[in-house]
Amino acid sequence: MDLLGCVLVSETPEGTCSGVIVETEAYRPEDPACHAYRGPSMRNRTLFGGPGLAYVYLSYGMHRLLNAVCEGEGVGSAVLIRSLAPLEGVPLMRRRRGRAADLCNGPGRLAESLGVGLSLDGHDLTLGEGLYIAPGPPPRGEIVSTTRIGVSRGAELPWRYLVLGERVSVPPRRISGRGLRRAWNVREPA
């Protein structure tokens, strides 16, 4: 939830793209939907590398997904960055996506728009270069939590966080009976 309102920046030779993080999902080692659930492997070793690392993997053999590792070395916990509100580099995002709309409302779309590739797995998101997360203003809308989407195990856990009023992958009104609730420790806009 602390990543909501932060700015995700991608600097590539093509140009710079950025957006405000407006939707995330948490994954913990005891969670059956987490890639760390069965322990370390070659595929998920970055999850166990310590906080601030990018965990990038291929979903369904075609979508690159970006996670931020969020706990100490050896723990295996991350936050999937699901949606952004674009700030900078929108023309480049459109070229990469091959369309004018739906640039960053979904984890695969935002990775494509920002040029996030598998080579960034293990990249330190705290260094302020290449791909990084920077502080941003408090979110404009109310922060809510709901159950996660797109997982078959652990789907009942209310570990999806989003900013109401922003374009997210699946708007709360389309989530029937999935436990929409106010999040705790909501940061008030300045």
From Swiss-Prot:
Domain of life the protein comes from: Bacteria
Organism expressing this protein natively: Rubrobacter xylanophilus (strain DSM 9941 / JCM 11954 / NBRC 16129 / PRD-1)
Protein name, per record: Putative 3-methyladenine DNA glycosylase
A GO BP entry: base-excision repair
Listed transmembrane segments: none
Record GO terms (molecular function): alkylbase DNA N-glycosylase activity; DNA binding
Keywords, sorted A to Z: DNA damage, DNA repair, Hydrolase
Lineage: Bacteria, Bacillati, Actinomycetota, Rubrobacteria, Rubrobacterales
InterPro entries: Formyl_transferase-like_C_sf, MPG, MPG_sf
